[in-house]
A protein has these predicted regions:
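Membrane-embedded alpha-helical bundles of multi-pass transporters/translocases
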Residues: 1-273
């Protein structure tokens, strides 16, 4: 397998991965506010949107404490396909299916039984978030396993970043055309439930196909240098992170960047619809 094909395959995986992330981070809440809870009862809309937002916030905060355990589980994985590929592929499929369901009213529960909707929503979102996080950890951790050559790893990482940037930004361009193309009612440019479900299904398919291409087009290499000889507890991981001021500043800078990027993407779409 040529190095170029391996780089491109890996970039396809990160392309679909960040395409999917944009659907979660930006466009799911736009679906919730502009379509799912957009009735004539303003107080009900605001109440349900507030509850959905709270559920997502709680899950995202909990994710900070879950991710180290996910990473530890991946690190202990041993299969004939490698350590990372099974998580990339299974994470892509399960996250895609659950997100497509989330881009619906879950069988009408949003209207007929709001409390049951929130319960089912929370369960599905947790499943989606865990498997997406597992895929995220696996896909970005497998670079050292793709080559023993440091220069080749740097080139592969560059291809991966290019793929992820294109994937994340392409969503902004195609989201409304896809939603409107599949919508029976344009709804003033916001589309309807059918259009948003189609968008989620297509996005999930893109992420899954990208993961499959990555799985087929790359090869993991075992190395004794990458083997974890000791078990690391969550407390030890957290302690190291808190003492690493350079890493904390990088994390803070990325937090500011992420907030700015998502604010721009959200406000742009809300402005035009």
């Amino acid at each position: 397998m040529s190095r170029f094909l391996s780089r491109v395959a890996y970039a396809c995986g990160t392309f679909g991965h960040d395409f999917f992330y944009a659907m979660i981070g930006t466009y799911f809440m736009i679906f919730v506010t502009s379509n799912l809870f957009n009735t004539n009862d303003t107080s009900y809309n605001e109440y349900m949107i507030g509850l959905v937002t709270t559920v997502i916030l709680v899950i995202r905060v909990a994710e900070l404490f879950i991710d180290p355990f996910i990473g530890n589980t991946i690190d202990k994985t041993k299969t004939r396909w490698g350590k990372f590929k099974p998580w990339v592929l299974s994470g892509a499929v399960i996250a895609a299916v659950t997100l497509a369901i989330l881009f619906t009213d879950i069988g009408g529960l949003a209207e007929t039984s709001p409390i049951m909707y929130l319960i089912v929503f929370a369960i599905l979102y947790i499943i989606m978030d865990i498997f997406y996080s597992a895929k995220d950890v696996a896909i970005w951790s497998m670079i050292p396993a793709l080559s023993f050559d440091s220069r080749e790893r740097e080139i592969t990482a560059t291809y991966a970043r290019i793929g992820s940037v294109f994937g994340g930004q392409l969503v902004t361009i195609i989201v409304i055309p896809i939603v409107l193309a599949f919508s029976e009612n344009s709804n003033g440019g916001a589309g309807d439930a059918t259009g948003w479900f189609a968008f989620a299904a297509i996005g999930g398919l893109i992420a899954t196909v990208g993961a499959i291409i990555l799985g087929i087009g790359t090869k993991e290499h075992d190395s004794a240098l990458r083997e974890n000889k000791t078990d690391t507890s969550f407390g030890q991981v957290f302690s190291v992170l808190m003492k690493n001021d350079q890493l904390l500043w990088i994390a803070f800078a990325y937090l500011i960047f992420g907030l700015g990027q998502n604010l721009i993407n959200n406000f742009n779409l809300y402005y035009f619809i």
